[in-house]
Design a protein with these regions (language model features):
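A domain-start/cap signature at the N-terminus of enzymes
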Residues: 30-64, 76, 82, 90, ...
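Gly/Ser-rich "nucleophile elbow"/oxyanion-hole loop immediately N-terminal to the catalytic nucleophile
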Residues: 55-59, 107-148, 158
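Active-site glycine-rich loops that stabilize anionic/oxyanionic intermediates
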Residues: 70-73, 283
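Active-site machinery of serine-nucleophile hydrolases
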Residues: 73-129, 277
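Short beta-strand/loop motif that positions the catalytic acidic residue
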Residues: 197-199
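Active-site-adjacent alpha-helix of alpha/beta-hydrolase-fold enzymes
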Residues: 201-275, 289-304
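Residue-level detector of functionally pivotal "anchor" positions at catalytic/ligand-binding pockets or at interdomain
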Residues: 231, 318-361
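Short, surface-exposed loop/turn motifs with a glycine/proline- and acidic-biased composition
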Residues: 354-392
């Protein structure tokens, strides 16, 4: 017997995405924690594996993290080698492991065998399909990747900063073509994308110093510092060398606070952005903390775990500025009626409700499903903007 699901069609979602989701309903079950998605995009069969934490419901509006493999690898490589599934349970996030065409991504590199597929379009269609199926949050979209997957994450942030809240690149920079296309005037605050870049100085595949059609790791980071309007001088901290036998050490370069990640016209109401660079001196073309054999080439740093650091940067304490950079929290834990009273009637763009990521939300007087419990920013009737802890 066939079971059909009712859909509420939205104008802002292309019809093709709905057709993808309707097709997927017939090829996988809804109970599995890891699901293989297969659909056509741009005339090509595209696949991805998706992990959903146990017990999650679409109403939870979880964030979505794309984990992109390196050249010659696959989504399965990343799933089996990086430990993101366990972290997804801790941080309550959906993880997607897409597959590139011919095990590569269209990074505009000109490298022999590189993909020419519309990977930006595919990955956004995948994100929209997952959002419609599992209820992930539209603006809580992240991408990270190894090597070519890092290149692709940079391209996503350059071309679609309106969709991604943050990216992370491990051993991946930008091609000179992609880098040139990414340059331009500073973006408005609501289009800033936070960056975490991790790179070994002894990387023999994607050189730390650049070359072979790629820019250097430091050039990538510095361009993002300018793009996000960060301080020119970073705070530099040496990570403890807890594992002395790995032939490498780590320095963290943190550029913060950058331009506020909030809507224009709110007087910097959004939290400050940031750029973080982890320089692994002596590190190879590897994923720090990884123990899987044949994953990369060269020294593997063991002083930190790249996957854990990425998830913390995306969704944990690393996602926020320091306490001194944030407005004081109020002790008040208001009811919904106290928070929403009057806001739904206001047409003033400087008033409203913003989440912790600086995204402005329309206020519905009765529909509270769009708002998570936790910290929200409110401004009403010319009052000073302030953070409020909304109830469960």
């Amino acid at each position: 017997m066939l079971c059909f699901t009712a859909f509420h069609f939205r104008k802002d979602v292309p019809l093709g995405v709905y057709l993808v989701v309707l097709n997927l309903l017939f090829v996988f079950g809804s109970d599995a924690q890891t699901t293989t998605l297969t659909f056509q995009y741009g005339g090509l069969n595209r696949t991805a594996q998706v992990y959903v934490p146990p017990g999650s419901q679409p109403s939870d509006s979880l964030p979505l993290v794309l984990v992109l493999h390196g050249f010659t690898q696959s989504g399965t490589t990343m799933l089996n080698s990086t430990g993101f599934n366990a972290l997804a349970q801790q941080y309550r996030a959906v993880i997607a492991y897409p597959n590139g065409v011919n095990n590569g991504w269209n990074t505009q590199s000109g490298m022999p065998g590189a993909s020419t597929a519309d990977d930006v379009g595919y990955l956004l269609a995948l994100a929209d399909s997952i959002r419609l199926r599992w209820g992930t949050r539209y603006h809580r979209l992240y991408s990270c990747g190894f090597s070519a997957g890092g290149f692709m994450s940079y391209r996503l942030a350059c071309e679609r900063p309106d969709r991604f809240e943050a990216i992370a690149s491990v051993a991946g920079t930008m091609s000179t073509t992609a880098f040139a296309a990414c340059q331009g005037p500073p973006l408005p605050p609501s289009f800033h994308v936070r960056l975490l870049h991790i790179h070994g100085t002894s990387d023999g595949v994607v050189s730390y110093a650049g070359g072979n059609g790629n820019v250097s790791a430091e050039q990538c980071v510095q361009s993002w510092v300018v793009r996000a309007q960060c301080p020119s001088q970073p705070v530099v901290v040496a990570l403890p060398n807890t594992y002395t036998a790995d032939g490498s050490t780590v320095e963290e370069f943190r550029y913060a606070p950058c331009a506020p990640l909030g809507p224009v016209g709110t007087n910097g109401a959004g939290r400050p952005g940031q750029v973080v660079f982890l320089k692994v001196t002596g590190g190879g073309h590897t994923w720090p903390g990884n123990t899987a054999p044949l994953f990369g080439l060269g020294n593997v740093n063991r002083d930190f775990q790249a996957s854990a650091r990425i998830m913390d940067f995306f969704l944990g304490s690393g996602a926020a500025a320091t306490s001194s950079e944030l407005p004081n929290f109020t002790d008040k834990n208001p009811t919904w009626s106290e928070v929403l009273d009057g806001l739904s009637l206001s047409n003033d763009p400087s008033e409203g409700l913003w989440d912790f990521w600086g995204r402005r939300y329309p206020v519905h007087p009765t529909n509270h499903g769009d708002y998570d419990s936790g910290l929200w920013l409110t401004r009403y009737q010319g009052q000073t903007t302030k953070w409020l802890k909304l109830p469960q």
